Amino acid sequence: MSFWTRRKAIDTITAGIDGAHQLKKTLSWPHLVALGVGAIVGTGIYTLTGIGAGLAGPGVILSFLIAGAVCACAALCYAELSTLMPAAGSAYTYSYAAMGEPVAWFVGWSLILEYTLVCAAVSVGWSAHAHDLFKAAGFPELLLNGPHVVLADGGHGLVNLPAVIISMAVAGLLALGTRESATVNMVLVAVKIIALVIFVVLCLPVFDASHFTPFMPNGFQARLPAGAGPDAAKVGVMAAASLIFFAFYGFDAVSTAAEETKNPKRDLTIGIVGSMAACTAIYMIVAAASIGASRAEVFSKSEAPLVFILETLKHGKMAQLVALAAVVALPTVILAFMYGQSRIFFVMARDGLLPRALSKVNAKTGTPVLMTLLTGVLSAVLSGFLSLKDIAELANAGTLAAFIAVGASVIVLRLREPNRPRVFSTPLWPLVAPAGILGCLYLFYSLPAKTQHYFLYAHLIGAVIYVLYGMRKSVLAQAEKAAS
């Protein structure tokens, strides 16, 4: 068997998921909607609203709608595959069964890229809201900003130390075996939503409809600004959508709850579409309130736009409360993605594509300490020296690749195994799966050329590792060797 045709059997992947290993079915659609909203609402709305508005103007509202629609298609595909293969590994595992080992490696490497960069991006977003706290503690601006930031004296920042600190702090907690409880998570979700409601209510009295004209000053399609070089950031509604896509991460938390859902055929659809619709509505309302209260070209220059707008409106104390809500709640997003990163490494190492030492679990804490700390270090380095925009765009490239693979996996398995029982079926899959793939491809095209190049370079490194190690050492390769 050629390495191109190595595939995992679905029955092998799901073997053992029964009896004592089956989760209790306790969730209904309200739980799933709450789970999705809690996982999705995070750095995107607190920080990327401003950056997106700088690219699209008031049209950023449309950018949120487009990004949400593409993610909804991908989410429905995730739901079908997660019930078909209720095992760790997410898109990597689905691709291994549907399209084979090389594609699975590509997807797994994309997920590693995505999760590490998401941790870094959220750390930078957290830093922007914690800036004043660190400044009050005596930290100089030089240590509160990365090299890309121009300081008041004309110089540049040295390192974003708060981002480095939060990255390593969360990694340390995970390495010790700390788990966030459901109760704490629900409280923090409530804190995030209440802060956004307060923001919208305070913006309504000063809402100015003239701020929405022109609605799309940079046009709809992603394009380079006039006179800009090929590596410059693209502008337009689609350019903002390709960045704002970051704001919808986390919906897969709903699809992974399939095994615990009482009526998955009905409730998963409601949970996924409901949470995506709720978050898209929340994002569009917050974006509209922001633009109504302050012109896009003004607040887009701030790394903490919601706080900036409230300060501009002379709501200093409320601005501090919104910033505090972000400081308290955003680390849970970092924790969730660092936890997920360790699971991707674990499954790939278990499959032999990476050294098995990487999946070693500490006997005392029950966590893969080495990989957790390595993820923390990588996140700290990236967040300490790069801008939120650059990190988020590169993270989006990895996620888009994974979403494309998930859509393709649904199509391949529907055609190859049409009669296999499915607990949840993607509605209108011949339309939804291709729509998700095409939407992701267009969003990838809308990313800056520099981001696309970095994504290619990262995968060239990954391809070398696969050829030198994974292709020969994988469990399937060893099985082939033993059988020959």
Question: Residue spans of the language-model regions?
Answer:
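Loop-to-transmembrane helix boundary motifs in multi-pass membrane proteins
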Residues: 24, 29, 156-164, 262-283, ...
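Membrane-interface loop-to-helix entry segments
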Residues: 127, 158-212, 216, 272-276, ...
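Transmembrane helix-loop boundary segments of multi-pass membrane transporters
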Residues: 50-61, 111, 122-129, 138, ...
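C-terminal membrane-solvent junction of multi-pass transporters and transport-like membrane proteins
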Residues: 155-159, 357-369, 403-452, 472-483
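Membrane-interface "cap" regions at the ends of multi-pass membrane proteins
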Residues: 1-48, 55-58, 72-79, 85-88, ...
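Membrane-helix boundary/coupling elements in multi-pass transport proteins
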Residues: 46, 87, 110-128, 243-261, ...
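Extracellular loop-to-transmembrane helix junctions
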Residues: 23-24, 47-152, 275-278, 285, ...
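Helix-loop-helix junctions that connect adjacent transmembrane segments
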Residues: 18-23, 60-61, 65, 138-161, ...
